[in-house]
Amino acid sequence: MSNALVPQEVSRRRTFAIISHPDAGKTTITEKVLLFGNALQRAGTVKGKKSGQHAKSDWMEMEKERGISVTTSVMQFPYSDCLVNLLDTPGHEDFSEDTYRTLTAVDSCLMVIDAAKGVEARTIKLMEVTRLRDTPIITFMNKLDRDTRDPIDLLDEVESVLNIKCAPITWPIGMGKEFKGVYHLLRDETILYSTGQGHTIQEKRVIKGLDNPELDTAIGDYAEELRDMLDLVKGASHEFNHEEFIAGELTPVFFGTAMGNFGVDHMLDGLVDWAPSPQGRETDQGKVEAKDEKFSGFVFKIQANMDPKHRDRIAFCRIVSGKYQKGMKMHQSRIGKDVRISDALTFLAGDRELLEEAYAGDIIGLHNHGSIQIGDTFTSGDKFRFAGIPNFAPELFKRIRLRDPLKQKQLLKGLIQLSEEGAVQVFRPLQNNDLIVGAVGVLQFDVVVARLKGEYNVDAMYEHINVATARWIYGKDERKVDEFRRKAEANLALDGGDNLTYIAPTMVNLSLAQERYPEIEFHQTREH
């Protein structure tokens, strides 16, 4: 099996995710990115539930009903000379750990900001996660066809709130009904706005040079205003610096309107030109480089029942190095077994195709009958494990109860499977038979009840429970941990992976426990 093409194939790949606050236009951007990459003939604009046309990237039943992205979809499309892997993340009001984990599987991120609102809470939270790995960030200021905030104010806010330098690449001319287009600072050209709706990409009129009299004819008084503004912008903002971008210290900023199919291509050009090709990763045996010939990858997400007809579960595996070939043998590090994979999948949001080959940077789907977990490492050469993917302590908790007590076994099976997939976390207290469900976002609770009913035929409901937070318990001295387990049993539980967890009714209770047991470590994250 010749792997001579590995370096060439790896260098043309770009793997990124989109991060944004709900309703900043992330799903629309996803559609338009696919449209410009020719993956969609008709980009499905997300409207209310009555519209029969659903966005390509929102494909689970619940998403179709609500018009929101609940699960992470993976889409691959060609653009320019590159092959782009886009990982779509839950973007609605309540998201889940899936979003965090997806950010560990990409090499760069596109941050979408609603130019009328600026930096919002969810964006701040997601940026914190990208900082764990200093991920390079490209920024798209969206919705310029509506009335927006002053562009300079927006850049100032990104710099001060998110602590990252901004380098404007395009600059808007007007806004709302008076939106005329953008000036591209690096190309010294003005691209005039003509709206394209749905799947039509309008021919763009481009005027070269800022002093070109054609510009005055085309946009009137806005031309002189633009020249004055650009003098100010060039003096007050940062120039694009590729090294700072790769280090996650500076973000190139593009302006446009995804709904109007305008500006998305400029941002995509920046992505393929500047974003890093697939990067290597640390393992317990040192670093693996993407262009190494031997295959390796890790599982960052498990999706149950992607196809209701098949009742299956798919493990999403990010290839870190080398090449996957149909029928190849891999070593699954956690269980120490060799497995032969002949039916890996590639995706366009729910449309699955069997895969002949894939390279570092690609995301492949592995059929999972319960033997694969989040964080699992697969290798074809040396045996090693990638540094784990974090589990984040839930922020919300409820007790789950059955309407039919005879279904306890099915309930536990469903909850354990959904927790392995990352839909929620489940905790079983040591002292009683309660089942506590923990989540990062409120909607996860609804998702779990709906899926328990639809996929496991279990009718469940929630009750309030007095829990403020959870912490995973570690200790170097096993005797001390055993002693702690006896003394604090009333507050202890096992999570879905049988890890000891402290369930705190209040933050004060947690502080007191930490003071009382200084030799015990209370962790907010746990590696898979």
Curated annotation (Swiss-Prot):
InterPro entries attached to this UniProt entry: EF-G-like_DII, EFG_III/V, G_TR_CS, P-loop_NTPase, PrfC, RF3_C, RF3_dom_3_sf, RF3_GTP-bd
Keyword presence, Cytoplasm: yes
Molecular function, one GO term: translation release factor activity, codon nonspecific
Keywords: Cytoplasm, GTP-binding, Nucleotide-binding, Protein biosynthesis
A Pfam family hit: GTP_EFTU
Coiled coil spans: none
A biological process from GO: regulation of translational termination
Keyword Protein biosynthesis: yes
Stored NCBIfam families: prfC, PRK00741.1, small_GTP
Protein name (record): Peptide chain release factor 3
Organism: Pseudoalteromonas atlantica (strain T6c / ATCC BAA-1087)
